[in-house]
């Protein structure tokens, strides 16, 4: 399985508090496999699964594993929360062994996760597990902390369903072109990935067609604001038709009539 680096954060702890910097690939000494684990199970069962943490650096690292809740906002941004705060979290039902460990250079550790699935569980639940290194001293007096995460989905297949709707379609003329804003809402109880397009028509003829970015994530009961940028339009009246593929049996569509002045 391909190793993945997901949500990597490099923290530089200086004399003026916490500063976040973007690491280069040379800075990263830890990776995890898999970056996303999907566990299909049944209510009331206990399950155990491994996540492999590998030290790719030239020196030993000390790592602490911890769970976190999260939400994905309408623009795709992640917000983290303490374990057990989210209604779709199983943080309190998951145990980690070992929680703290050392890894020698070029070696790896398999960390075991056990989950006691509640008897009334339905649909899909999600968590992040962070693997955080002990601060190490670098040049300039900074202490460097590396943090990398793996995403965990616990899925009850018999009660999982996907669904979606378009709540609104709007358009906005900006300097870089015509922006088509599509509000998608996940009406199911599992995460989905979006694709699709907008078609702009005038007098029955298609004058522009814009594809959405691929693989936009919308978590259970979440929302996504899709921003598709097309060419500038000449003044006039147009019809905008948005079509979203969320992985269900049919596309969902929304339409708006706009006037460009």
Regions found by a protein language model. Give the residues of each.
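Beta-sheet-dominated interaction scaffolds and their linkers
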Residues: 26-59, 98-100, 164-175
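Surface-exposed binding patches on compact interaction domains or structured appendages
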Residues: 28-34, 57-110, 195-198, 202-208
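Beta-strand-rich interaction surfaces with strong enrichment in secreted/lumenal proteins
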Residues: 37-40, 96-103, 153, 169, ...
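Ligand-binding face of N-terminal immunoglobulin V-set domains in extracellular IgSF glycoproteins
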Residues: 48-52, 61-67, 91-137
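Short edge beta-strand/loop segments characteristic of extracellular beta-sandwich folds
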Residues: 50-54, 114, 179-187, 229
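Short, acidic/polar linear motifs in exposed loop/turn regions
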Residues: 56-59, 71, 119, 186-190, ...
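Short proline/glycine- and polar residue-rich coil/turn motifs
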Residues: 101-108, 215-223, 260-261
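A short tyrosine-centered beta-strand micro-motif
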Residues: 125, 129, 236-242
């Amino acid at each position: 399985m391909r190793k993945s680096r997901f949500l990597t954060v490099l923290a530089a702890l200086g004399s003026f508090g916490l500063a976040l910097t973007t690491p280069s690939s040379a800075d990263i000494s830890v990776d995890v496999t898999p970056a996303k684990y999907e566990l299909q199970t049944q209510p009331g069962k206990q399950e155990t699964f491994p996540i492999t943490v590998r030290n790719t650096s030239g020196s030993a690292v000390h790592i602490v594993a911890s769970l976190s809740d999260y939400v994905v906002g309408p623009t795709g941004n992640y917000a983290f929360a303490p374990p057990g705060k989210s209604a779709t979290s199983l943080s309190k039902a998951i145990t980690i062994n070992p929680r703290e460990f050392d890894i020698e250079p070029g070696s790896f550790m398999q960390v075991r996760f056990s989950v006691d699935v509640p008897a009334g569980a339905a649909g899909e639940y999600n968590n992040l597990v962070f693997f955080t290194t002990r601060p190490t001293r670098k040049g300039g007096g900074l202490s460097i902390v590396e943090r990398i995460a793996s995403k965990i989905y616990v899925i009850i297949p018999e009660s999982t369903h996907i669904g979606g709707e378009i709540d609104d379609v709007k358009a906005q003329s900006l300097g870089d072109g015509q922006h088509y804003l599509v509000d998608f809402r996940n009406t199911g109880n599992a995460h989905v990935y979006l694709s699709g397009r907008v078609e702009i028509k005038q007098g029955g003829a298609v004058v522009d067609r814009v594809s959405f970015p691929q693989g936009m994530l919308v978590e259970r009961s979440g929302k996504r604001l899709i921003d598709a940028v097309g060419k500038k339009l000449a003044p006039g009246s147009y019809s905008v038709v948005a079509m979203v593929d969320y992985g269900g049996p049919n596309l969902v569509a929304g339409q708006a009539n706009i006037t460009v002045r």
